[in-house]
Amino acid sequence: MRLLKMIGVLTLSALFAVSCSKEAGTTNGPQEGDCPEEMILDIKFLGQSKPSHMEIDNQRKKITLDFAEGVVPSNVELKLILEDGVTMKDPSENPFVLDLTKTCPIVLAYAGKDYRYLVIANLSGNDDENVMRDGPVSDMALMYYGGSHRIGMSDWTSEQLRSNVVYQDRNGKEHWLFDSFLFLETSDGGGHYFESGFDDPNNPRPNEKGANKSDWTKILDKYFAADGPIARLDKEVGNAIQRVSVPVYKRRVVIFLPVPFYRQTNWGTLSGKAMDFSVKADRVEASKWYVDEVIRRFNKLNANYLALDGIYYVAEQLTNNRDYIPTVADYIKSKNLKFYWIPYWGADGMGEWKNMKFDTAFLQPNYAFPQTKPDYDSHFKSIMNFASSKGMDLEMEFDEYALYNNKLGDYRADRVRDYLRAFKAYGVTTKNKIAYYQSNCMVHSLKTSEYKQDNDLYHEICTMIVERQRRRGED
C-alpha cells in the first residue's frame, strides 16, 4: 500500500470527488447558470482540530482537508463562508461539527435546488481504530490489456469497466463489486514477451524474445494515457459514487512488473549503460526504473478515486528469477507499495513466496483449463491443503469456455460453479483474499449475454463477491 506523500502529511483516506447527486432531490452536477461557480468561498475552523492544508473544489463539489500526524479529526467545528444566495440545508446550522474520521456529505441550497458536497479528511498514519484507513485488497480483478492481440477483446471500454466496478442485481440495484484492479499483460502481441517461461517452466523462452525497454515504456504509455483504461476506471468509480454510495475503502490499482529475461542483452540502456540481464544488478536496476515510472505516471494521472496499491510480478514461476526478486521486493516496499504474485498449481517455486518477499501470493487452482475435467474432490483438497500450509490466498478462474454459446466446443460453467462451491466449503470466501482471472472481460460478457445461462452465472459470481464486500462494510 502506498501512502501518498503530501507536505508533512501521509494521506490515508480517499479523495472521493463527487458532483451534485440526483438522490434526495439533488441535481446531478450544476448546469450552466444553475448555481454560482464558487458556492463555498472559504472555511473558518473554530475549534482546536485544524487542518494543515485545505482545498475547496467547487466544480467537483469536494472539500479536502489534510491533518498532520497525530491528529484524529473526530470533532471538527467549522463555518462555511458562502456565496450570496447559498444557504445550508444539511446540516442546517452554520457553524457545525463534523466527525471527519469518515467521509461526510453536506448539502447546500441555491435557487430551489440542492447541491451535495463531500468533506474528506486526509489522515496521517494513526493507530486509532476509528480513523478511516486504506482498505486491504479483498477481491482483485485481473485486467489484461495492452498487447495488440487484445484489441477488440479486452479494450476495457467504459461499459466493460462499469461491469467490474459495480454489480447490478436482479432487481436492478447496484452494489460495489471488485475493490482492486490488476492491470497486466503477457506480451506486446508481436513476439516480445513480458513474462518468461509462460509455456514451459523448464524451457523458458529464448532471451531475445524478452520485451525491451521500448516495449516496457509503451505498455505504461497505454495504461496511463489521459484517455486510457486507468483514467476511464477512475471516471467510472466517480460515476458509481453518484449512483450507489461513497465506498468505505479506496479502489486499489496494481500494475504488473515485466520480467527482465535472464541473459537478455538487447533490452536497452539506463543512464547510458547497456543492460545485460545475465548480471543481477542490471535486472534489479531495470526493475527499479520501471517501478519508479509506475509511481511517477500514476501521480501525474492525478486520479480522484483510485490509489496505487502495489506491483504484481508477472512471471508465474521462479525459474531463472530467484536471484534478483528479493532485492526488487525490498525496493518496492521502500516505496510503500505491496508486492503480489500469482503462481500456477505445480509451478517451480510456488510455495517459496515468503522467501521471495512477496506480500501476498494467490495460488491458481487451474481447475478450469484442462481438457479433461479434474476430479473435484481430490483436486481442490490438494489445492486447499497446500495453500493453507503455505499461507497463500486463492485465485478464481473463468474464461470464454464458461459462455453458454461459446465456439470452443466445450461448455464449462459447471467448473466455475465448482470453484464457488469449493471456495465456500473450504472457507476461502470468508478468510482469504481472492484474485479473479476472467480472460478478456468475462464479467462483462456474462452480464450482457443474450443467454439466461450466462446471466445466471454472472449473478452467482457477483453475489459471492458482494457478500464478501458487505462483510468489510461496503454495499
Predicted region positions:
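Bacterial N-terminal signal peptides that target proteins for export
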Residues: M1-G8
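C-terminal motif of bacterial Sec signal peptides marking the signal peptidase cleavage site
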Residues: F16-S19
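Beta-rich interaction/scaffold domains
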Residues: S21-D127
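N-terminal catalytic cores of secreted or lumenal carbohydrate-active enzymes
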Residues: D128-E285
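Structural preference for beta-strand elements that scaffold enzyme active sites
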Residues: V137-Y144, H175-F183, K250-F256, Y305-Y312, ...
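Substrate-binding cleft of secreted/luminal carbohydrate-active enzymes
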Residues: E174, F178-D179, G346, F358-K373, ...
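Aromatic-lined carbohydrate-recognition surfaces of secreted/lumenal glycan-active proteins
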Residues: K250-P260, A274-Y290, A307-Q317, A329-M350, ...
